[in-house]
Design a protein with these regions (language model features):
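Short, compositionally biased P/S/T/A/G/V-rich stretches that sit at domain boundaries
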Residues: 4-5, 15-44, 57
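Beta-rich, blade/repeat-based domains predominating
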Residues: 138-149, 185-195, 225-236, 268-280, ...
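Conserved beta-strand positions in repeat-built beta-propeller and related beta-rich domains
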Residues: 153-161, 201-206, 241-246, 286-290, ...
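A short helix->beta-strand "capping" segment at the edge of beta-propeller domains
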Residues: 118-139, 172-176
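Beta-strand-rich domains and repeat architectures in extracellular enzymes and scaffolds
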Residues: 131-167, 180-193
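A short beta-strand motif characteristic of beta-propeller blades
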Residues: 129-135, 176-182, 217-223, 260-269, ...
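Short loop/turn segments that connect beta-strands within beta-propeller blades
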Residues: 170-175, 213-217, 253-256, 298-302, ...
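Surface-exposed, short loops/turns at beta-strand junctions within beta-sandwich domains
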Residues: 86-94
Length: 353
């Protein structure tokens, strides 16, 4: 019995020392500083904003980073902090703002929040006028359209995994498929564009860009990339590629390396699901997957300058087909053509601003 009492007393004494120690350590896990907002923060491009933060008086050597770069430091911060952020120094898009520092005991802490820089442009609302209706092959799951001179090229996908993906020369006036090259059933064809004497075709999940000779359609080489492949276009110098998100990657056509990335935003939100792309008079026209809208994008900033309502095309042209997809611009005649996946009709359209 005495042994039991001694053991109980020892445990009690140890507990009287250990419990406060654990409680103290637990209390110290709370960061000595925090931002003055809990959810994502959205600011407009061009604004200079003051982001609030506060400390409990125990923080020191606090560093603020934005997009991975240091923007402000506080050696002995006050309890109320004001973090200055000039949005003009950054591209529009999503960023992380981080607060790093230590408490009086030297314990390191980090606080992270998300900040989005929105466009300062309210998109205009444009519409489409149907100028002419042309036949389109209903078996073509259109993923990309592009002109080289007067020759129309089409890239298709393969939703049934039967090896139907291809790149083909198409007769604009009849819709007939001429010379073509097919992909095996393991590869799902996506957007196409033409630069010089080469055709670039993306694949959806294979992480491959296929490069063909424009005249012979001979496969010349393949480039690797890490994302999904959706749409692609060119300004005659570089390639612009979408991956189904709000991001557009600017790529070097010689090696497919990323030159830079832009994010596509309106003055209110990001525009995800960017699909087929076409470069038209200095701007990128992008189908927005599962919608009847086409985004008109500044390729330098990612700002959406206009949203085109193509509902009239969908209502007339879809038939038993699927979504609107496919934009081709004929530069010499300044004419634009649009269609959709498995659509029986190709439309020559005029943009009404």
């Amino acid at each position: 019995m005495k042994k039991i009492l001694v053991i109980v007393l020892v445990i009690g004494l140890l507990g009287s020392y250990l419990v406060p120690m654990f409680m103290k350590d637990s209390a110290n896990t709370e960061a000595p500083f925090q931002f003055g907002f809990s959810d994502n923060l959205a600011i407009k491009y061009g604004d200079v904003v003051s982001i609030p933060a506060e400390t409990n008086g125990e923080a020191k050597n606090v560093t603020i980073t934005f997009g991975g770069k240091v923007i402000q430091k506080f050696a002995q911060p006050k309890e109320k902090l004001s973090i200055q952020l000039d949005s003009k120094k950054y591209q529009i898009g999503a960023y992380e703002i981080e607060m790093h520092g230590v408490d009086q005991q030297g314990q390191y802490f980090t606080e992270i929040r998300n900040v989005r820089i929105l466009s300062d442009v309210t998109p205009e609302k444009w519409k489409l006028e149907i100028v002419r209706r042309l036949p389109h092959n209903e078996s073509s799951f259109t993923q990309g359209l592009a002109f080289s001179g007067d020759q129309l090229y089409e890239g298709t996908g393969d939703p049934n995994q039967t090896g139907a993906s291809l790149v083909a020369k198409v007769n604009l006036n009849t819709g007939e498929i001429g010379q073509k090259i097919g992909l095996d059933a393991t590869r799902f064809g996506e957007g196409i564009t033409i630069l010089g004497d080469q055709i670039f075709q993306l694949t959806w999940l294979n992480h491959k860009c296929l490069v063909y000779n424009k005249e012979t359609l001979e496969l010349l080489k393949e480039f690797d990339y890490s994302t999904e492949g959706w749409g692609i276009c060119t300004d005659g110098k570089v390639l612009f590629m979408s991956d189904g998100s709000e991001r557009i990657y600017v790529r070097n056509p010689k090696n497919f390396d990323i030159i830079k990335t832009i994010e596509v935003y309106t003055n209110e939100f990001a525009i995800p699901r960017l699909n087929e792309l076409e470069f038209v008079n200095g701007l990128i026209y992008a189908n927005i997957w599962t919608s009847n809208e086409i985004a008109v994008i500044d390729p330098l900033s990612g700002k959406v300058l206009a949203l085109i309502d193509a509902t009239n095309l969908v209502n007339e042209g879809k038939g038993n087909g699927e979504v609107l997809n496919g934009i081709a611009y004929h530069a010499k005649s300044n004419k634009m053509y649009m269609t959709g996946k498995f659509w029986p009709t190709m439309f020559e359209v005029k943009v009404l601003k």
